[in-house]
């Protein structure tokens, strides 16, 4: 059973004064960590959807070797919102994929084993949605959606994501606990500062 991996990295970084995905962390750009996490997980293929600053990001990512090939896809309509990037990711996956794990590109602390835990839960239960939660049960990323939900994901518009699909079936959603520290996303300057301080970086 094949599960695809989609890294969503097309955003405008609107809440930061600079392109966040290229900010340095542990000697690499933030996005490198998310892509490496996905490429090292039991998913195939891995698609990274780019948009804002795609030329620069592409040139940087191509200097790295990942555990498996990473397909770089540009979302020409990235300014219209997150839904268009989800759609590009889905359209980039082969028909053989039974589902896909979606991961924002600004989560540098997640591990391949965390993605693997979602895949394992899906393979064991067949649940149409498997989501990461922290120790308190709060919804987090990544999220695995079965192919049966791809049409509904592809029909989303604007800044809609799969949040609504998750909420409407929350009691039946399979939850996989991931340590809170690892599901941190970096979407503000303050979040980036806290990330660096937690690592002892200036």
Predicted regions and their residues:
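Nucleotide phosphate-binding site architecture
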Residues: 13, 23, 150-151, 193
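A broad detector of the eukaryotic-type serine/threonine protein kinase catalytic domain
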Residues: 43, 149-150
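Short glycine- and hydrophobic/aromatic-rich loop-to-beta-strand nucleating segment
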Residues: 141-145, 184
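Nucleotide and nucleotide-moiety/phosphate-recognizing core
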Residues: 2-105, 109-139, 171-178
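Conserved alpha/beta core of the MobA/IspD/sugar-nucleotide pyrophosphorylase nucleotidyltransferase superfamily
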Residues: 1-2, 151-202
